[in-house]
Curated annotation (Swiss-Prot):
Keywords: Hydrolase, Sporulation. The keyword Hydrolase applies. It comes from Bacillus subtilis (strain 168). Induction: During exponential phase and in conditions antithetical to sporulation. Belongs to the spo0E family. One of its GO terms (molecular function) is hydrolase activity. Its EC number is 3.1.3.-. GO terms for biological process: regulation of sporulation; sporulation resulting in formation of a cellular spore. It is an enzyme of class 3 (hydrolase). Aspartyl-phosphate phosphatase which specifically dephosphorylates the sporulation transcription factor Spo0A-P and negatively regulates the sporulation initiation pathway in order to control the proper timing of sporulation. This is Aspartyl-phosphate phosphatase YisI. The keyword Transferase does not apply.
Amino acid sequence: MNSKIEEMRITLIETAQKYGMNSKETIQCSQELDILLNTRIKEEMIFGRYLENSRM
């Protein structure tokens, strides 16, 4: 997951440099990165809860 996030972050930077910060291409990349980050956060929260419950 981390490599996908890093790849999308680089793509976002390159897209913003090429098309501008407010272009539809940049916004789309930003939204895709948001999805990846939110998924990672949810997975970490779920895994953290699993670890807490397994210690009980």
